[in-house]
UniProtKB/Swiss-Prot annotation:
CDD domains: ePHD_ATX1_2_like, PHD_ATX1_2_like, PWWP_AtATX1-like, SET_SETD1-like, Tudor_Agenet_AtEML-like
Family: Belongs to the class V-like SAM-binding methyltransferase superfamily. Histone-lysine methyltransferase family. TRX/MLL subfamily.
UniProt-listed SMART domains: FYRC, FYRN, PHD, PWWP, SET
Task performed by this protein: Histone methyltransferase. Dimethylates 'Lys-4' of histone H3 (H3K4me2). H3 'Lys-4' methylation represents a specific tag for epigenetic transcriptional activation. Methylates only a limited fraction of nucleosomes of target genes (e.g. NAP and XTH33). Involved in epigenetic regulation of the floral repressor FLC and FT to prevent the transition from vegetative to reproductive development.
GO biological process: epigenetic regulation of gene expression; methylation; regulation of DNA-templated transcription; vegetative to reproductive phase transition of meristem
Protein name, per record: Histone-lysine N-methyltransferase ATX2
Motif Nuclear localization signal mapped to chain: 77-84
Catalytic activity: N(6)-methyl-L-lysyl-[histone] + S-adenosyl-L-methionine = N(6),N(6)-dimethyl-L-lysyl-[histone] + S-adenosyl-L-homocysteine + H(+)
Statement: the UniProt record of this protein carries the keyword Membrane: no
Species lineage: Eukaryota, Viridiplantae, Streptophyta, Embryophyta, Tracheophyta
Gene: ATX2
Distribution of this protein across tissues and organs: Expressed in roots, leaves and flowers and, to a lower extent, in young seedlings.
Organism encoding this protein: Arabidopsis thaliana
Region ranges (Extended PHD domain (ePHD)): 682-807
This enzyme's EC code(s): 2.1.1.-
Region (Disordered): 422-443
Amino acid sequence: MISMSCVPKEEEGEDTQIKTELHDHAADNPVRYASLESVYSVSSSSSSLCCKTAAGSHKKVNALKLPMSDSFELQPHRRPEIVHVYCRRKRRRRRRRESFLELAILQNEGVERDDRIVKIESAELDDEKEEENKKKKQKKRRIGNGELMKLGVDSTTLSVSATPPLRGCRIKAVCSGNKQDGSSRSKRNTVKNQEKVVTASATAKKWVRLSYDGVDPKHFIGLQCKVFWPLDAVWYPGSIVGYNVETKHHIVKYGDGDGEELALRREKIKFLISRDDMELLNMKFGTNDVVVDGQDYDELVILAASFEECQDFEPRDIIWAKLTGHAMWPAIIVDESVIVKRKGLNNKISGGRSVLVQFFGTHDFARIQVKQAVSFLKGLLSRSPLKCKQPRFEEAMEEAKMYLKEYKLPGRMDQLQKVADTDCSERINSGEEDSSNSGDDYTKDGEVWLRPTELGDCLHRIGDLQIINLGRIVTDSEFFKDSKHTWPEGYTATRKFISLKDPNASAMYKMEVLRDAESKTRPVFRVTTNSGEQFKGDTPSACWNKIYNRIKKIQIASDNPDVLGEGLHESGTDMFGFSNPEVDKLIQGLLQSRPPSKVSQRKYSSGKYQDHPTGYRPVRVEWKDLDKCNVCHMDEEYENNLFLQCDKCRMMVHTRCYGQLEPHNGILWLCNLCRPVALDIPPRCCLCPVVGGAMKPTTDGRWAHLACAIWIPETCLLDVKKMEPIDGVKKVSKDRWKLLCSICGVSYGACIQCSNNTCRVAYHPLCARAAGLCVELADEDRLFLLSMDDDEADQCIRLLSFCKRHRQTSNYHLETEYMIKPAHNIAEYLPPPNPSGCARTEPYNYLGRRGRKEPEALAGASSKRLFVENQPYIVGGYSRHEFSTYERIYGSKMSQITTPSNILSMAEKYTFMKETYRKRLAFGKSGIHGFGIFAKLPHRAGDMVIEYTGELVRPPIADKREHLIYNSMVGAGTYMFRIDNERVIDATRTGSIAHLINHSCEPNCYSRVISVNGDEHIIIFAKRDVAKWEELTYDYRFFSIDERLACYCGFPRCRGVVNDTEAEERQANIHASRCELKEWTES
C-alpha cells in the first residue's frame, strides 16, 4: 500500500538524502506498517515518503515523488503554502489575516500555522456533521481495512488507528463534506467516461430515418442509404449521388451499379449518419406523421371517421385485429353465416364474445376475441399499428383504403368468402386428409386462424374452368406455341370432369404447362387427378386422349353409356382452355405486360431472382464507344453494311454483324432483347458474365454474345447470314471453363488467352474490349475483300488479342509529341517591330478589322486559350443584382422536354429533333476554341441532338473556297463537312449552329448519315449521356497526310492533332511506289 503525505519542500541535496535513508532503513530493519498519524502528520519525526512491503514478498512498489515544499522559515511578505492531497478544496470563507506579531508569537511557542488552522476548523464542526463524517469514515475504514489486511497489516494496529487523525479531520473540514478521495476520484473518472460515451455516440454513424421538412435537398447528396422494397422485403444499400431540380427527385445509385430517381418522401429509406453530421446539415429524425407507407394519413383518418357510425362491431366493419405473435393488421368483420361450414372457424372460443374477421393483404380468416379488435379510427389516431414493417402491410393498407372509399372488397377476398359458403371449398380440400389438421391452420388460446387453400386462389373463373396461374410467355424457345395458340410456361387451371374411379361422379382435374427437364426447350403438358395420378404429353390432346381412353374402358367394363355425350370428343386444347376467347385474350395481354411491382428487370439480372451457377457475378460495362458496332467494334459505315441502333437500349450494330437482312425502312428498330415478345428477365450469356449487348440464342436453348461466339475458337454460327444460332458451346474445352479472367476476376464463362507465345494471361473477350486491350484482326484490310454471297469454306481471318504487357503499339502514334511542337513554337512567337514606328500615330486600317493576321493570330489565340472557360450564352431579362456564371447556368429552372411516346419511325424522330433543338441547345464561349454549343437540357445516349446543315458542294469547289477565300478570313474559320468523296457540306456562310461544335479526342457526340423519306441528312447523335450545360464535341477525323492541325481539347487521351491518324496510317500502307509494283501475269 502506497501512503502519501504533505511534506515541506526541501533542497535537492536533502531530497537525495531522504531517498538514501529510506532505502537504508528498509534494508536494515524492514517495517511492516506505520501509524497513520506518522504518515499524515507534518510534525512527525519520520517526515518522509515510505514504501512498505510485506515480509517475504517479492513485489516492489516504487514510491511516488511529491513536490517538496520550501522551508518553514517565516518571511515578512509570504505565507507558507498548503499542499492539497487527493481532493480539491472548496473556496473558504475569508478570515482575518494575522499580523506579523501574531505569527512571530506562534512560532516562538512551537505551534505551526497549519495545525492551528486544522484545530480551528475542527472546532467549528457541529455535532450532526461530525456524526455524518464518522459514518463515512467508518465506511472508508471498512473498505481500507480490507486492503491493509491484504498487505499484511495487523488487525490490532487497525483498531489503534480507528480515531481519525488531525490531518484526516482537516481534509474533511476543508472539503466541506465532500466524498472521500477514492470516491471523488472514481466520480471524476465516471464523468470522464460519460463524456467519452457522449462524444463517441455523437460521432458514431447509425441507420436512421430523417425528416425532409426544412432541409436543403442537396444536403442529402453523398449520404449512404438503404431503400426498402416492400414486394421484395429487402433493404438495398446505395448512396445519394445527385438531385434533379426539375423533377425534385434524388438520384440513388445502388451497390450493384444500378441507379434510379426517387422521391425520398414517398419511399422507406434509412441513412447512415451521425449526430454531429445531422447538426451540421440541419437535419432531424424522421417520423411517419405525414405519410404512412405510401398512404396519406390525413385522408385515411377522414375516411375512417366518416365510415365509423356505431360503437359495437358489426359485419362489414373495418377494424384493427391483433393475433398473438403478430402485429396489428387491418381486417374486416365477416358474417358468421359466410363460413359456417368451415372446420375450426365455427368453434366458439373461450373468454367471452368473439368475432370472425378476414385480413386485408393476406386474406386469411381468423376468429378473435372482441378485446383483440380495435376500431380502425382509434388505431389510426394512436398510430401504434402503423409501425409495422412487414412487406404486405402496405398492400393491406391499400386494400383497406379502397374499401373505405368504394365500400368494395378486393375480388379475391369477396371470392374466398363466397367459396367458403359453398361446396367448392369441400371439393378443393377433397385431395387433403383434413383441412383442420393442415399446417396452414393455427389455433391458440382465444383465437383461431385459418389460411385459404392454394387451389382456391383462382385468378379467373370462366364457366367451370378456374385459372389459378396464367404463367409467363416463353421467348427463348419456339416450341411453346403453334400457328394458333401460345402456351405460357407455368399455366395452371382446374376443371370438373368425369371421375376415373366412378363414371357417375365428377372430380377435379389440375392442368399445367411445364418445361421439359431434359431438353429444356420443349413444353410438357401435365394433368393431375384428385387422387394424385398424373398424365403427361407433348401436346394438350396427348394428355386428354389418355384420360378419354381410361374413361372409355371404365364405361365399357361397367356397361354404362357415355354420361357427357360429346364431352369425350373435345380436344385437349379445349379442355386446357386455350381455345376459349377470354383465355386467349388474357394470354395475349401477357405479351405486352411487365412486372407490376417495383422489381425491375435490372434487379432480376443482378442475381437476386435467378438461380445463377457457382461463381457467377454479373459484370456491367459502361461502354464509352457507343458509335461503334457492339459485335465487330468498328465505327465505319458502308452502303452495304449500315448501322442499326436499338431505340430502347441504344445499342449500335452493323446489319451484317447482327444478321438483319430485311431493311427496316425508317421504322425504329429494336434488338432481340428489347422487342415486345422478349423475355421478362433478360437472359445471361453462357460464355461470359457481362450483362447486356448483342446476344443470340444457342442450339441448346441458352443465350450468348455474338462477340464471345466469334472470339472463342470452339463456337461457330450455323447460319452466317442470319448470325444465329450459336453452336459448339458444349464443345468448348474444359480447361477453358476453368480459366479465371484477369480483368473482372469472375470464374464464370470461357476465357481466351494472350496471343503471345510465352504469355498465358486469360480474360473474357468483352472484358478485354472494355479494358482497352488489343483485340483486333490479324489482317483487317482483308475483311473488306470477303464476300457474303460466296459460301466458300476458306473465308476466314485470324483473330489476335494481347494482354496489357504484350499489346502492340503503332510507331505512327509516337509522332504525337512531334505534332504538338509547332503549336508550342507559335505560342512563343513574338510579333516583329512595326516598320512605320510608333503604332499610336498610325491611322486605323480597315482591312485588318477582323484581327491580326497569321502567325500573330495563332500566337494570340494560343495564349488567350489558357484563360478562357466555358460560358454559354443565356438570354435573360434585366436584373439589378449580378449573379455568378455558375448560378445563372446551374441555378436556372428549365423544364425537361420529354420525348413523345407515339414516335414510331425515324422520320418522326427527326421531325421532333428539328422542332426542339432551339430549346435544347445554346451557343457560347468555349474553353477549347472560339465558340461552342452547350446542352441546356440533359440528353440520353443515342438521342438526336442537331442536324449539320449548309451548302452542298463538290470537293473541288470546297477546296478552292477553303484555300482562296476562307484561309484569308481570320476569325471566320472553315466549316467543311465531307459526306463522301463526291459531296461536301459548306456551313461557313449558311446553315445551323451545328458548325460551332468543336473537336475533341474524347467526344460526347458522333455524326451519322441517316435517310429520311429518301433524303440523306447528317445528324449529330449523343455518344453517351450528356449532362446539362455540358459542351458538345465530336471527332472531326480530319484526313490529310501532309497537313497537321493541332488539338486543344485538353482530355487525358488527346492525340495532339485533329487528324485521323489511324485512317492516314492505313492509307499510307495501301499506297506503294511505282518501283515496288510487280507486273501481273496469269498463272
